[in-house]
């Protein structure tokens, strides 16, 4: 406790030592939102991001903990970063044995039992952290115990895990939490500098290329929605608030005027910004009354000088929620990249993902976005549990076609069994889940973590794994000798690595020489070295 009798809270973001593989290098927005809410309530709070340290993250965290007296250390967890998050949790426990160590985030919400089994946690927060942490701070001020806090799980003396549900934040509560985000305190400059170095911006051959890269790097993220309700079977985030509440949570999001207020706040707080990224899993709905007024409000704010005329925007959208009218309005407002969760170009696989309804919208809406000068960014999963080899071939061919037309693509080879996702819970798929043995550094604790849901067809599974092995070999060599490769280049690598393997099974995807030439042309630096590497590895 500080002199005023208020607890001190240290919030630690998810730790991705391979930053860019599981996360994007940016301030952990959910953690900063929690910090803003706690600070507004008079709770001294600090954010520690292990992905943006000037020294080893473990050493930096040790220094941070030793330099303060922390009553609570909160550890954020995700499925992909869990072993690293747990490493920091155990480190915090060793350095601050009297502090409450609290887990939160996606993985903690779906697997509180695993948190207590593997970690040194006193408490696990389920779902949104604002209300439970405020309640925890109130109890610590009053010298009360932590039992019975809604939205938490704890382990009893006899080893049972007792979970208490909580209602998701309503619209006003969500609005207040978002407006509490302390953008003025967030060290974006440090992140931008690291990204510019990683992407070797100074080595780009033209001013236009450098400016385009800076527009992508100097971005600030804004969340305006509590969750995506679409129920994709591979997704865990769609079930996050339902799990914490114990029932279906209501949707809540900012309205157009509130979005504009936040944009103006962000610009004032971070004047070097080039792009606002709306980090909502789904920015617009089919029946959406916000998108057109928001675009008009942005255009008006630019004309009035309230925000810079050059400010650009990126969002993730339902492709079946797009129309030429909406796309035109977004282009005029300054949207330059539109993310679309296409996931797969096979109608059969889309049905398996609970996305069959988007199939007929893909071709016309991608074409319309490109014709208006915007860049669609497509998220793809190369295979599904019930995919055929033809499904894989269709997605590879279409991915290559849309890359040539101007889209950018991020690609995964198979479904990852995220905790809480419908496919991860499907017992019929259990024989096709591959596990990876994970170890928590510095502890000797290990466990088997689900890592891949492979196609049921053994031929398809073998093909996908062979493509993955080839991709990993080539990616490792390229990134060690050239530069960090963004997803747009990784997608070309996936396609290149698939060509010979798919051809063995009678599926022509594209010309190898053409794909290789396209990769050479896009490599960010040291093209001669990269050319030799690719030729040697393919």
Predicted regions and their residues:
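Glycine-/small-residue-rich active-site loops that bind phosphorylated ligands and cofactors
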Residues: 53, 80-81, 107, 283-286, ...
């Amino acid at each position: 406790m500080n002199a005023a009798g208020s607890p001190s809270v240290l919030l630690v973001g998810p730790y991705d030592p391979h930053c860019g593989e599981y996360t994007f290098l940016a301030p952990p927005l959910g953690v900063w939102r929690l910090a803003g809410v706690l600070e507004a309530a008079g709770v001294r709070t600090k954010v520690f991001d292990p992905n943006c340290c000037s020294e080893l993250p473990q050493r930096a965290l040790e220094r941070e903990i030793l330099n303060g007296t922390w009553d609570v250390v909160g550890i954020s967890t995700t499925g992909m970063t869990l072993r690293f998050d747990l490493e920091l949790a155990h480190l915090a426990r060793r350095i601050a044995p009297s502090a409450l160590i609290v887990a939160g985030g996606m993985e903690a919400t779906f697997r509180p039992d695993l948190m207590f089994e593997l970690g040194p946690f006193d408490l696990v927060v389920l779902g949104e952290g604002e209300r439970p942490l405020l309640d925890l701070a109130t109890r610590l001020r009053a010298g009360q115990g932590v039992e019975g806090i809604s939205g938490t799980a704890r382990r009893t003396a006899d080893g049972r895990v007792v979970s208490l549900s909580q209602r998701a934040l309503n619209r006003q509560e969500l609005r207040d939490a978002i407006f509490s985000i302390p953008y003025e305190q967030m060290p974006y400059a440090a992140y931008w500098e690291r990204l510019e170095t990683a992407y070797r911006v100074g080595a780009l051959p033209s001013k236009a290329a450098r400016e385009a890269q800076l527009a992508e790097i100097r971005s600030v993220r804004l969340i305006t929605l509590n969750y995506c309700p679409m129920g994709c079977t591979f997704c865990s985030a769609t079930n996050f608030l339902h799990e914490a509440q114990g029932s279906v949570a209501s949707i809540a999001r900012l309205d157009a005027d509130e979005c504009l207020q936040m944009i103006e706040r962000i610009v004032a707080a971070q004047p070097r910004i080039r792009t606002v990224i709306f980090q909502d899993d789904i920015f617009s709905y089919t029946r959406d009354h916000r998108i057109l007024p928001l675009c008009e409000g942005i255009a008006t704010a630019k004309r009035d000088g309230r925000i810079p005329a050059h400010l650009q925007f990126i969002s993730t959208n339902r492709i079946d929620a797009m129309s030429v009218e909406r796309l035109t309005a977004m282009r005029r407002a300054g949207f330059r990249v539109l993310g679309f969760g296409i996931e797969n170009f096979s109608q059969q696989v889309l049905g398996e993902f609970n996305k069959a309804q988007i199939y007929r919208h893909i071709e016309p809406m991608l074409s319309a976005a490109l014709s208006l000068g915007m860049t669609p960014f497509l998220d793809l999963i190369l295979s599904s549990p019930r995919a055929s080899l033809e499904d894989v071939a269709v997605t590879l061919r279409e991915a290559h076609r849309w890359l040539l037309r101007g889209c950018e693509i991020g690609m995964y080879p198979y479904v990852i069994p995220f905790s809480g996702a419908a496919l991860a819970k499907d017992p019929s798929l259990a024989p096709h889940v591959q596990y990876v043995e994970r170890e928590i550094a510095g502890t000797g604790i290990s466990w088997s973590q689900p890592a891949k849901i492979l196609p049921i067809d053994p031929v398809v599974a073998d093909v996908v794994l062979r493509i993955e092995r080839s991709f990993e070999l080539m990616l490792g060599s390229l990134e060690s000798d050239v530069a960090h490769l963004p997803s747009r280049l990784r997608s070309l690598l996936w396609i290149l690595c698939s060509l010979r393997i798919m051809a063995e099974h009678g599926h022509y995807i594209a010309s190898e020489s053409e794909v290789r030439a396209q990769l050479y042309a896009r490599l960010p630096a040291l093209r001669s070295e990269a050319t030799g590497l690719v030729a040697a590895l393919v």
